């Protein structure tokens, strides 16, 4: 393993085949030594820890996080105590309480956490999830009317509601009590109701802004137990052990792509440990439906196996399937729901492929992806609103800039869109501003993702508004769009032992990226194109030793073309992944970027 030298660009790569610079992830030398001494780490791992901003006094908690050390005081969240009091009041009074959840994994996980706590308290909590196509995102007056007609007295919204001031006002006007639990960006003035608990609420000093909604709900469960205990409700009985449900908190954190630091890292790390038992009937059934075997749970299970299938219900099927799956204790019901979600996921993939192909052709025909503008906005008639977010993410990866994809209903002229952003460009804030300026019918989100509703004849205005509003962030964001390398390795050193050494830094996500390794002047052997535009090959060093490698969705891009051409002389950056196919314990490199030394300036 080598250090890559002192060049301002790692291996001299000032422009890779994807247009990015390569840099060594910076780490302060004194901090590297401190981690080596305090934790007994080898230099490469200590350097990676320091490069992730982990202080000397944080190293032990980072590598072995615990809830005891990192759990925040629930009362540090604005309105948390009021929310706990209102919900426990309802449980004690036997009031009809319903949960209103968003239709993604975070919403489903949040709802399931509350359902399981209510069940442990001997109470029921019916779930309401709006239909993405007919109702759209978040609470509405019509939805609250429906809940009122069903006999609801208290409604708890999860993963939504913080920006639904008008809808919540309507709910209160018709006699409903409302508690909002959310994590999305919101206006200064919250909805007027019993409580608005939001880790990103202006004035909230919890310091937990990186939590998903499921993380906020998990803290709420602790507050509920505390309030119920204060009232003597656990005299002679055990309080619900909320640690059993950490797997649901981890699902929300991983699938909502939250920053895995501090308390949120502990939730996720310990949640994956709980998930590894596969005690939740819904998760176990969904894993089986996906054709995977139970075993130690990783972020990959949540983000790439379970999460897309749970989301499929909200994207192109029945929105409440995911929440019902995660809430049920009936193995047969779980199996039926899991099989339905797996089938919907297959259908979703085909719809996604069609929309992606159309969007790529439309944008690249006009050159909008390469005209220097900070944002790409692309629309199409009758593109399924359930897949526009996934497509936006694919195109963001392809063009390395924020992308908003809008599906327009050709009948009513209303577009529903979703956007994905780049680090350093706050798309949620820009969309919120567009809504407040009257450009949108609805809109909101967070830094890296946003959703919106817009009239078709306002899309051009939206494009101009976003480009103007985000232009100032573009230079800094482009500087951030670098491939940051943790270490230079030879193919012979890219082993299972190296993978397991750096796996101590898991779980990975925003604020704790997977280790990135660079291989210099490798020879590409056995290149082959795969279905889906993927490329597989072997990367060999001067001594002939090689490592398996795969590059996703790049066969038609310069990096993929260079790999398919084969031959020597390329530099490759990527992440090591476990390769346990057919019982072998190997590794393969998941390629992030490719550079040709003849083209790096």
Regions found by a protein language model. Name each.
Residues 168-169, 205-208, 293-295, 393-394, ...:
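A generic local secondary-structure boundary/capping motif
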Residues 17, 25-31, 35-154, 174-175, ...:
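Hydrophobic helix-and-loop "lid/oligomerization" segment in the mid-to-C-terminal part
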Residues 15, 89-93, 333-378, 411-412, ...:
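Mid-to-C-terminal polyanion-binding domains and interfaces
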């Amino acid at each position: 393993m080598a250090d890559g030298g002192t060049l301002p660009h790692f291996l001299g790569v000032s422009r890779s085949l994807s247009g990015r610079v390569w840099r060594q992830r910076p780490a302060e030398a004194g901090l590297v030594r401190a981690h080596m001494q305090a934790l007994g780490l080898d230099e490469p791992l200590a350097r990676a820890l320091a490069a992730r901003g982990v202080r000397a006094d944080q190293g032990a908690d980072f590598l072995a996080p615990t809830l005891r050390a990192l759990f925040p005081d629930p009362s540090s969240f604005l309105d948390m105590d009021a929310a706990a009091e209102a919900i426990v009041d309802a449980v004690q009074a036997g009031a009809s309480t319903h949960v209103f959840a968003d239709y993604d994994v975070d919403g489903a996980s949040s709802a399931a956490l509350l359902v399981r706590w209510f069940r442990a308290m001997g109470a029921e909590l019916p779930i309401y999830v709006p239909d993405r196509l007919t109702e759209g995102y978040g609470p509405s007056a019509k939805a609250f009317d429906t809940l009122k007609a069903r006999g609801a007295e208290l409604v708890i919204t999860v993963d939504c509601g913080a920006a639904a001031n008008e809808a919540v006002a309507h709910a209160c006007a018709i006699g409903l009590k409302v508690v909002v639990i959310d994590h999305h960006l919101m206006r200064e003035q919250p909805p007027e109701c019993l409580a608005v608990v939001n880790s990103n609420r202006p004035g909230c000093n919890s310091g937990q802004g990186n939590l998903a909604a499921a993380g906020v709900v998990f803290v709420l469960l602790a507050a509920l137990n505390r309030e119920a205990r204060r009232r003597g409700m656990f005299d002679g009985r055990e309080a619900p052990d909320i640690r059993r449900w950490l797997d649901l908190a981890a699902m929300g954190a991983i699938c909502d792509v939250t920053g895995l630091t501090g308390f949120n890292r502990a939730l996720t790390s310990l949640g994956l440990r709980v998930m590894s038992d596969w005690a939740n009937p819904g998760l176990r059934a969904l894993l089986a439906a996906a054709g995977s075997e139970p075993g130690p749970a990783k972020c990959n299970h949540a983000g790439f196996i379970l999460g897309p299938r749970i989301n499929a219900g909200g994207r192109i099927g029945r929105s409440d399937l995911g929440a019902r799956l995660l809430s049920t204790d009936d193995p047969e019901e779980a199996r039926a729901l899991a099989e339905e979600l797996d089938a919907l996921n297959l259908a979703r993939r085909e719809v996604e492929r069609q929309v992606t192909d159309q969007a790529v052709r439309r944008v690249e025909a006009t050159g909008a992806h390469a005209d220097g503008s900070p944002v790409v906005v692309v629309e199409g008639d009758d593109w399924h609103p359930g897949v526009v977010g996934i497509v936006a993410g694919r195109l963001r990866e392809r063009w390395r800039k924020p992308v908003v994809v809008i599906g327009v209903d050709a009948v009513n002229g209303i577009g529903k869109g979703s956007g994905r952003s780049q680090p350093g460009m706050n798309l949620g804030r820009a969309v919120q501003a567009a809504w407040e300026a009257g450009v949108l019918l609805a809109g909101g989100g967070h830094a890296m993702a946003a959703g919106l509703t817009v009239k078709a004849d306002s899309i051009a205005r939206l494009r101009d508004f976003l480009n103007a509003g985000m232009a100032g962030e573009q230079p800094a964001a482009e500087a951030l769009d670098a491939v940051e390398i943790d270490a230079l390795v030879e193919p012979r050193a890219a082993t299972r032992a190296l993978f397991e050494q750096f796996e101590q830094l898991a779980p990975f996500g925003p604020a704790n990226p997977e280790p990135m390794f660079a291989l210099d002047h490798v020879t590409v052997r056995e290149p082959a194109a795969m279905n889906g535009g993927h490329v597989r090959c072997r990367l060999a060093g001067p001594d002939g030793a090689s490592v398996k490698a795969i590059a996703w969705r790049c066969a038609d891009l310069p990096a993929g073309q260079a790999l398919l051409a084969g031959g020597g002389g390329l530099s490759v950056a990527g992440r090591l992944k476990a390769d346990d196919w057919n019982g072998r314990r190997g590794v393969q490199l998941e390629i992030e970027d490719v550079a040709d030394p003849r083209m790096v300036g």
